[in-house]
A protein has these predicted regions:
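Membrane-interfacial amphipathic/re-entrant helices at transmembrane-helix boundaries
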Residues: 1-17, 45, 52-58, 129, ...
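Alpha-helical transmembrane segments in multi-pass membrane proteins
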Residues: 14-18, 38, 42, 46, ...
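Transmembrane alpha-helices
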Residues: 17-20, 95, 174, 179-199
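Short, non-helical or kinked segments that cap or interrupt transmembrane helices
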Residues: 26-42, 77-91, 159-162, 208-209, ...
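Alpha-helical transmembrane segments within multi-pass membrane transporters and channels
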Residues: 54-94
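Transmembrane helix-bundle core of multi-pass membrane transporters
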Residues: 85, 89-92, 96-156, 185-186
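Membrane-helix/interface signature in polytopic inner-membrane proteins
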Residues: 149-189
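Conserved small/polar residues in nucleotide/adenosyl-binding loops
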Residues: 200-206
């Protein structure tokens, strides 16, 4: 049973990352390698912030914002500086490697006995008795579903429709008087925000040490 739960947890963790990659590779047709840097960015931020006593839920929000900033910078490099999409992602990925090490201060961070989304007083109270072994799986499932439904909601907004249109036919979007570059930047920001969240607190149930590099 432990092995099955672990597989489910890892699958749902990577499902959030897959949502972000789906936006860049499938919707925008943008080979974004920024995710190689924004993925461990979530680990670095979460480990540092929760070690300073920050609320775990707030850390998720901060991690998403940090990933969104990374995606925005990739978009700006591509759109404003006219750098090829693949190269702009490589530039940001390389920069984030240094940023992640700077944030963490070391190559790996211990996370023993820290208050996280999976180890706090509320979780111990709600998931007691027979539910205790399923606590991590249920929490990850809830977070994954929230991310999925929020993305579905966004994709049904005007901005979401424009995002899909840019990936299908940039000419139509331009003819509507919409800056396709701005839409690309928004898409990259959301995608990298999701990727960062996937490695924030979601790795904590499976390890006692977060690897940054």
């Amino acid at each position: 049973m432990t092995l099955v739960l672990s597989v489910l947890e890892q699958g749902m963790i990577y499902a959030i990352m897959a949502l972000g990659i789906y936006i860049t590779y499938t919707i925008l047709d943008f080979p974004d390698l920024t995710v190689d840097g924004s993925f461990p960015l979530g680990a670095a931020l979460s480990a540092v912030l929760i070690s300073k006593g920050m609320n775990p839920v707030l850390t998720l929000v901060i991690a998403f914002a940090a990933g969104a900033v990374a995606g925005t910078l990739t978009g700006l490099i591509h759109v404003k500086l006219k750098v090829r999409d693949l190269l702009s992602g490589i530039i940001m990925m390389t920069a984030l490697y240094t940023v992640n090490l700077r944030i963490a201060g070391r190559a790996n961070l211990p996370i023993y006995n820290m208050t996280t989304l999976f180890d706090n007083a509320l979780v111990k109270k709600v998931f007691s008795g027979a539910l205790a072994p399923f606590a991590n799986t249920i929490i990850i499932l809830i977070i994954t579903l929230i991310m999925k439904f929020l993305l579905d909601w966004y994709m049904n907004t005007k901005s979401g429709y424009l995002l899909r249109a840019v990936g299908d036919n940039e000419t139509i979007v331009t003819s509507m008087g919409v800056d396709k570059g701005v839409i690309k930047i928004i898409g990259l920001a959301i995608a990298n925000g999701l990727v960062t969240v996937s490695y924030t607190h979601l790795t904590l149930p499976t390890t006692s040490r977060v690897e940054i590099s």
